[in-house]
Amino acid sequence: MQESRSKESTLSGDEDKDVHRFLDEFDDKCTCKLLKEMKETLEGLKKSHPNPTNLDEFYRLFERYLRTRHEKIVWEKIRSPKDRIVQYNEIPEPTEKSKELLRKLAILKLNGGLGTTMGCVGPKSAITIKDGKNFIDLVVKQIRYLNSKYKIDVPLILMNSFNTEGMTDKIIFRYDGIKKFSQSKFPRISSETLLPVSPSHGDKGMYPPGHGDLFYSMKNSGMLEELLEGGYEYLFVSNIDNLASTVDLKLLEYFATNELGFLMEVTDKTRADVKGGTLIEYKGALRLLEIAQVPSNKKSEFTSFKKFTIFNTNNLWINLKEMKKKLEEGFFDLDIIENKKALDDETVIQLETAIGSAIKYFPNSCGVVVPRSRFLPVKTCSDLFLVESNLFVEKNGTLQLHPSRVPETCPTVKLIGENFSKIEKYEKCFKGIPDILELEVLTVSGNVLFGKNVVLKGTVIILADEKSKICVPDGSVLEDNIIYGNLPIIDH
């Protein structure tokens, strides 16, 4: 009887093919119906959209998403890209030629992000970092120093988003010569219907689609053509919150001399970077692999140090002529990242792309393993604590490790809990940022308040019990201390 059931439930090879063919045809019909609904909805949204052609680009992205969303990377086909990875210290020192190449260079800072993870209501670039200066102020200072030193005029370009352009304009009005354009404005889609959320959400129902949008937006805004007509051939791109991403003549000359189309700066992975994208060789091409593309059963392997030892800093060098050529050929179908967000009580999807994934379209591309000193992002209040401290000194707009710091690495800082997750609460925890020149490890959790002129050395762990408070008095020196429990300060 058991054998009979088994035979009844087994399909022949032809029957199995028929089932798959039926499912594929059904899926195609559903996709076509959904695409038709999407097109009709987008036509309605065009009436109120500031740049209706953005929605045509979104439709193309959405169609590609539907066609490819079930495709998975074949883990076994991933190879080490060691033949395409160059060590920074193996690159020749720059010659006089590099100074001439500067005349063909433009600098672009990615400025589309809000500091929402840190509780900011405006662009992250507006956060004050050193001596009353924010990210934009410091970047402008960097460029002015570069231009003054070499008697040139390297332009600064900001790629804003609809979220950041208003406040950014209020910051840059006092600076001359900054070029700018805004990236696309795409509709968020419902995770249930896969159609745009209600227009009643206003701008909350829209989003900037990641920095991979740079290629389309540079072309669409006219910025690409403007740069090429101005004689610029090379573009250095980086995140505006990475104040260590300055122009490096050594990299510029290497990029130009080797006639590369795309160069990605990578650096050695630490425990703080386990989720960062990495370079791989896949199907004969150099590819950026992001954690969102990794199968769930392989994520632990991805975040380990054994197989993937480097990660993407998002400091990128791009040949503008090559970029234009690829755009004219219709390339840059970048890997799509499905980013789920909460909008009121609804789960929505943002279809995003990463600029680094364009590397696969440039056969003449490579990764360069640069020193960690070229990567100093501010993603959390723990990062902000480091750059605000005396660990870094500002020189010509760049943050550099204090010369007295030994070893020449950053301490490990973990500020844990709701008091340190948002800037407003974080700032209330410090009367002054402690001296951390001799700090190795700092972990702070709970309701902890720091007084003025505090010095932290070695390993310091401060853990406040739930519903209790620890106050570190003015002038305290903590060295290799563990403090826990409840320690209020009583004024006398």
UniProtKB/Swiss-Prot annotation:
Binding site for substrate: 112-113, 211, 239-241
Protein residues bound to Mg(2+): 124, 241
Annotated disulfide bonds: none
Assigned keywords, A-Z: Magnesium, Metal-binding, Nucleotidyltransferase, Transferase
GO MF annotations, alphabetized: metal ion binding; UTP:glucose-1-phosphate uridylyltransferase activity
Oligomerization, as annotated region: 441-492
Reaction it catalyzes: alpha-D-glucose 1-phosphate + UTP + H(+) = UDP-alpha-D-glucose + diphosphate
Keyword Magnesium: yes
Signal peptide: none
EC number(s) reported in the record: 2.7.7.9
GO BP term, example: UDP-alpha-D-glucose metabolic process
Residues at which UTP binds: 110-113, 124, 183, 210, 241, 379
Subunit structure: Homooctamer.
UniProt family annotation: Belongs to the UDPGP type 1 family.
Protein role: Plays a central role as a glucosyl donor in cellular metabolic pathways.
Name of the protein this chain belongs to: UTP--glucose-1-phosphate uridylyltransferase
Organism whose genome encodes this protein: Encephalitozoon cuniculi (strain GB-M1)
Species lineage: Eukaryota, Fungi, Fungi incertae sedis, Microsporidia, Unikaryonidae
Gene name of the record: UGP1
